[in-house]
């Protein structure tokens, strides 16, 4: 396959932080299309190991000498200006390319679908890819999470379409000039970058209005801010979806069960026509995932995917790593790992957990970033209603300095003030298994929530619970 975005032979492209989920996907696509790729990261990971096997040169640790011989440097917002590789790149006058700019270059080569929204981007991107695959369109995919069906977050397809996750966190998603845009929802998030919610809303409107006159945007009419945006967007075609009776692609008769969600869909475009799908199966729990599936259905129908392929693609959807992923069952207690770290995401995940749990729902939360906890504190205090017990860990700083009065203790106090009946602070990760063992009984579901290293706790917990059960003792603090 020859999809080189420039007409020249260039040397190695160096990625600073190549193991990151967004960076690794772009690097993989470039490797698979014949580029020389190298990069550095602070520590080895599954992503760096995969890229190395594909031919990338990987450096562990950041050092100025790593960029010797590089043609250009790709970086993300997470990379600080004083990173030695960035300093050396500027000294050598190498092109410094933002991650979104490099993704935009790859998107230029195909018709593109960019999936945006405050929440649900990764899952929706994966669902769009799955249905297009089922319909024989074989898309290229660059996602913000590991797609279980691929075992990776990126895939080079032979078809005309590329499906990408559009990350709004630093505003650079506006560089992605897509043929098709998706907006799942718009909530207050990344206010450290945008300053206020009005700027967030304006960015998503610009994202939609970036599409060409022949493209379209699929937007979720269930979300009030998205619905309000539809009134402001001019000269661009919108396809609405949701459970809202006014949506053109809408779900009804939604049922949750052990196998996931079952629902029916009616498609009624405003210019006429009627299509219905009865009793679709999505092997994921939660109404929010039904909404994500509706986005994928809306896009697929516009691209001509058959109803049968849509049905098969959804039924076979294998999910995304860290999106309601079961890590094990110990003594009848199911342990689930989820990336949810915003109050809206947490509430949706816990509602899904409540729908499928045979017993209690126990939430373990590791707040992600002090600024997010501070800016959305009241929302955090109100988003755990579907959890019978909430266990609160220390904040995962993600490079931020602590903020006085913002942390584990304040969230515990806030949850209790908001009326939550059982909230427990986690003294240390080593004590989690003992605490869960005291709370959980067969049939209960324990969901670990956060974007930090809590995922490692989720994978360790089933074994630790089994060990405690076998020994009859308590975990060491």
UniProtKB/Swiss-Prot annotation:
It holds the Pfam family Mur_ligase_C. It is found in: Cytoplasm. It comes from the Bacteria. SUPFAM superfamilies: MurCD N-terminal domain, MurD-like peptide ligases, catalytic domain, MurD-like peptide ligases, peptide-binding domain. Pathway: Cell wall biogenesis; peptidoglycan biosynthesis. It catalyses: UDP-N-acetyl-alpha-D-muramate + L-alanine + ATP = UDP-N-acetyl-alpha-D-muramoyl-L-alanine + ADP + phosphate + H(+). GO terms for biological process: cell division; cell wall organization; peptidoglycan biosynthetic process; regulation of cell shape. Keywords: ATP-binding, Cell cycle, Cell division, Cell shape, Cell wall biogenesis/degradation, Cytoplasm, Ligase, Nucleotide-binding, Peptidoglycan synthesis. Belongs to the MurCDEF family. PANTHER family: UDP-N-ACETYLMURAMATE--L-ALANINE LIGASE (PTHR43445:SF3), UDP-N-ACETYLMURAMATE--L-ALANINE LIGASE-RELATED (PTHR43445). Cell wall formation. NCBIfam families: murC (TIGR01082). This is UDP-N-acetylmuramate--L-alanine ligase. It comes from Phenylobacterium zucineum (strain HLK1). The lineage of its organism: Bacteria, Pseudomonadati, Pseudomonadota, Alphaproteobacteria, Caulobacterales. The gene is murC.
